Amino acid sequence: MIRTRLCGFALLCAIAMVYGCSLATDSDDVAVHGNPVITTEDDIPAVIAAMTLEEKVGQMVQTDIAAATPQDVRQFGIGSIISLIPEGNLKTTQAWRSIADDYQQEALQTRLGIPMVFAIDAVHGHSYFDGNSVILPHNIGLGATRNPRLVEQLAKLTAKELSATGVRWTFSPTIAVARNIRWGRTFESFGETVQLQQMFATPFVEGYQGADLTAAYAVGATAKHFVADGAVDDGVDRGNATVTEMQLRAMHLPGFIDAIDLGVVSIMASFSSVNGEKVHGSKALLTDLLKNELGFDGVVLTDWEGIDIGGLTLKEGLNAGFDMFMFAQSWKTSMPAMIELVESGEVPMARIDDAVTRILRMKLRLGLFSRPMSSPQYADSMGSTAHRDLARQAVRESLVLLKNDAGILPLDKQQSVVVVGSHANNVAYQCGGWTKKWQGAHTDLYGHPARPVDGATSIIDGIRNLIGYDNVIDAGVSGFNDVADVAIVVVGETPYAEGQGDRAAADLVLSSEQRTLIQRYHDAGTQVITVLISGRPLLVGDQINQSAAFVAAWLPGSEGEGVAEVLFGDYDFSGKLGFSWPRNANQIPINVGDPDYDPLYEYGYGMTYGRSMVSE
């Protein structure tokens, strides 16, 4: 047996000896010229029966292009590649398709010719693409739109930009119901209620997958993270969710059920635990509930290195019900270890066959057996005017007007305005995490350098485009200029993603520099219009009091002009809060329906020009 402690070149040689023999088995009964005869699901059992154990395990492996070459895909039969393009500044769709096709060509040269599937995290547009893709508002903003039809169109927009680069599978949508704004992934949630989860789960799946998954633009969707990750205690990412069975079923499951009913091809498990049991090791959740009770027949996928990060074993993950494992470099040791677990009887072959059946079923549904190579059909849609117009509409509809004293908004396009603040001219900040790289396009806490967001418009440039360059006085990040009567102060959070966004309740505040900036303009008698860029409500009561108008703009993405169009009256505000806005740290967590519910702004609150409203 190959030992899991083997590493590097010696390990690859050892694996190759096993695979080199096993992949040579005759397969004429299920293949024609190396391409499997899978045209319907009825063909899958014969292919499964003809596969070696090594080939089956290869299909269950997903890794990224930094960890596996196209030749590795051919030699070891790897089932999926995550297209996290290394920092090579590949800015064209053709360059990405070329990479995808290089991997696919090698997959098609395996004994059975089973295609691999290229996948990516596209959680708010094709946000990892180095070029001019459209970056959409994050889910917290989309939830504020209360417009599921728009969200379906945005998902279809994303699918077209993904397909233009050879990507056929996205790890989206996140349909967590976030119940504590301390949680660093709150911005990935549509809101604090199951009603919003259900309002947007199916439009996302419909937009990605379309009526015909084999269509040139369609991509497979992933509902995540199963289950109750938004309910983690104290908002601790990857922590434990203490929930009753009724809460689990009534609050956190319905969106997944809706996605399953619509045919979502995959579901990703949560890093977190439910009532002390890690989801990545839970047969009760992944098999008994998800597969058996809910009837999900798609692929159940781990999160990134979810087994290792969760402190679990491959045996636990396999027997819990995972079909595909997301690995980095560890695929090199995990594949022989998985084979050994089956050969020793610790994992039954039936469990492996179930996994591979689901993987082949997904690939069939994605049209990979009939159309394995990428298509340039939607290359011209990447960053197109039509796509940016739609994203700008999403920005406009996501904005929530919290305050508008004396009807100061909309502003007059003929007047001069000061624009100031850390987020006024910073596209990376307005896009947030999961943009160009994991923690965001800025220079992040890990020291990864900033990446450009090509084609994006900052908020200040959006204002300039709308009212003219001469009417905008740029005061920089923290400058003071009292020439104009009105100052648009754009401030907020620095981007973060999972693992870096959790906060103590008392720390959900603006920086001291930002607070001082707002106060300085207020004390000078300037009318302050505060635009807050954040992934959740913050404790900003004092800043609201110091502002004549206050706008929650969330994380609007690449189309900053959408903010300007509403501030200056081309469009009205229509956004509504998907989260209750706390008065103070002691109220956190606060959710609609709580006893003694008394937030600063209620769930569903949002003003239009001239009146306030509460929709739910």
Question: Each PLM stretch: what is its role?
Answer:
Residues M1-F9:
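Bacterial N-terminal signal peptides that target proteins for export
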Residues V18-G20:
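C-terminal motif of bacterial Sec signal peptides marking the signal peptidase cleavage site
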